[in-house]
Design a protein with these regions (language model features):
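Membrane-interface helix-loop-helix modules in multi-pass inner-membrane proteins
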Residues: 72-114
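Extramembrane terminal tails and long inter-domain/linker segments of multi-pass membrane proteins
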Residues: 196-208
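Membrane-interface transmembrane-helix boundary segments in multi-pass integral membrane proteins
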Residues: 148-185, 206-208
């Protein structure tokens, strides 16, 4: 409800972290953006596999429509992470596993979009980009799970955890959940609009 959102926003606005002060509020953009950067690519991978198996245009076009959104979220993750890192680590960038995997993920997003623009006709473009997307899914998975298996460097562990001792404070936890829901809802809306537009373009092309 609006009251829940306004209450959460008010609490976040007033509260400061005793170590990071105001900079901790970057978390409400950084974490949802990172969540989408990874999961949008994984969704693209699933859609690409569906295209290769079932040859359904909607799956290929949904993957295509997701790519720019995922790219923007990846860039937002890297920028906000750099700003946050400058405050907490004293540097904008370090080549630790999490950051490096996101840099590679960014390259795969850019490469995917370029391939869609460069290759014709649609079927061939869908085939090539689907294979490319599946290859890049390895780095999307690394971006998500690498902190569980190897030394995470300067980057912190998972922000949200089922272990209450490792979880963030409740005053940030619930507003962060709301931010995740908001970002995810925006993605779904944009995906539906962009995919519908792509399908309409395809219909007009086939009719013409």
């Amino acid at each position: 409800t609006p009251r829940v959102f306004s209450s959460a926003a008010s609490d976040v606005y007033k509260r400061q972290d005793y170590k990071q002060l105001e900079t901790v509020k970057i978390i409400f953009i950084h974490v949802p953006a990172a969540f989408l950067a990874i999961n949008v690519y994984l969704m693209m991978t699933v859609a690409s596999i569906v295209w290769l198996i079932r040859r359904q245009y909607v799956s290929a076009l949904a993957a295509k429509s997701s790519a720019m959104i995922g790219l923007i979220m990846t860039i937002a993750t890297i920028i906000t992470g750099s700003l946050w890192g400058s405050s907490t680590w004293g540097t904008y960038w370090v080549w630790d596993p999490r950051l490096t995997s996101f840099a590679v993920l960014l390259c795969f997003y850019v490469g995917y979009i370029i391939l869609w623009s460069a290759i014709k006709p649609l079927e061939r473009a869908a085939n090539v980009t689907s294979l490319f997307c599946i290859l890049g899914s390895v780095f999307a998975l690394l971006s998500r799970y690498i902190v569980f298996f190897i030394d995470q460097g300067l980057h912190q562990g998972p922000t949200l955890s089922l272990d209450e001792e490792k979880n963030i404070d409740d005053s940030y936890y619930f507003p962060l959940i709301l931010a995740l829901v908001g970002f995810s809802s925006l993605f779904v809306y944009l995906l539906l609009v962009r995919t519908t537009t792509e399908l309409n373009k395809l219909k007009l092309k086939l009719m013409g």
